[in-house]
C-alpha cells in the first residue's frame, strides 16, 4: 500500500531522484499493480468461509515469499490452528515455502507462475515423475483439475477483501508515517473490515 506514488521514466522505472522518501524513511520503493510506489508491503490472511481477516502483517520488503512463515505464525497465534488448505499467489511460491508446507503437512496451493486473467494452465496428465523437485511437484498439483478449482477460490476469497478495503472504502494509502504506525493503521483497517462482516452477518441472522 502506498504512502505516495512515484515519478517514473519512459521505460516505467522509478526516476533516479526518487530513491528515498525523506518524510518516511522506513518505506521502500515497491512494484505495485499500477506501477512503482513508495510504500509498504501489506499482508492479509483471509478465512475462506466468511472473508474474515485472521492475520495481518506490514513490512518494507518487496518479496512476498519471505512473509509466509511469519504469517503462518500469526494465524496460529490468533486462531490456535493452521488452515486446512492454504492458497497463495505466485509471489509466495518458493522452494523453501513449498518444502516447509510439505514438512508441516499443510495442504498448500502456490501458483507457480502468474497467469493472464481468465486463463487456466493445461491440466496435468499421467503419473508424476519420481524425480520432480519442489516446484515441479507444486506445479503438477495446481494443474490437476482439483488444484485448479482450489486455486480459483483465491479470486473470491482474498482479492475481494482488498477490493472492499481499497476500492469500496477508499482506504488506498496510509495516512501515518513509519513502519510501526503503518502496521497499526493496517491492523485497524482489518479490524473495521471484520466488524463490518460480523455486523452484516448478525443482521442477516436476525
Language-model segments: what does each one mean?
Residues 1-206:
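Anion-binding and metal-coordination hotspots
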Amino acid at each position: 500500500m502506498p504512502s505516495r506514488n512515484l515519478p517514473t521514466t519512459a521505460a516505467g522505472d522509478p526516476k533516479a531522484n526518487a530513491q528515498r522518501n525523506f518524510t518516511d524513511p522506513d518505506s521502500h520503493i515497491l512494484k505495485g499493480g499500477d506501477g512503482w510506489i513508495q510504500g509498504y508491503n501489506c499482508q492479509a490472511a483471509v478465512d475462506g468461509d466468511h472473508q474474515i481477516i485472521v492475520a495481518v502483517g506490514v513490512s518494507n520488503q518487496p518479496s512476498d515469499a519471505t512473509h509466509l512463515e511469519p504469517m503462518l505464525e500469526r494465524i496460529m497465534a490468533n486462531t490456535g490452528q493452521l488452515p486446512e488448505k492454504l492458497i497463495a499467489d505466485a509471489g509466495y511460491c518458493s522452494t523453501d515455502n513449498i518444502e516447509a508446507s510439505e514438512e508441516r503437512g499443510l495442504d498448500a496451493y502456490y501458483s507457480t507462475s502468474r497467469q493472464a486473467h481468465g486463463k487456466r494452465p493445461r491440466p496435468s496428465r499421467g503419473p508424476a515423475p519420481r524425480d520432480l523437485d519442489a516446484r515441479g511437484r507444486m506445479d503438477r498439483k495446481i494443474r490437476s483439475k482439483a488444484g485448479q478449482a482450489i486455486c480459483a477460490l483465491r479470486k473470491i476469497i482474498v482479492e475481494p477483501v482488498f477490493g472492499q478495503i481499497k476500492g469500496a472504502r477508499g482506504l488506498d494509502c496510509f495516512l501515518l508515517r513509519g513502519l510501526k504506525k503503518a502496521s497499526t493503521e493496517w491492523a485497524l483497517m482489518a479490524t473495521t473490515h471484520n466488524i463490518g462482516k460480523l455486523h452484516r452477518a448478525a443482521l442477516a441472522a436476525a
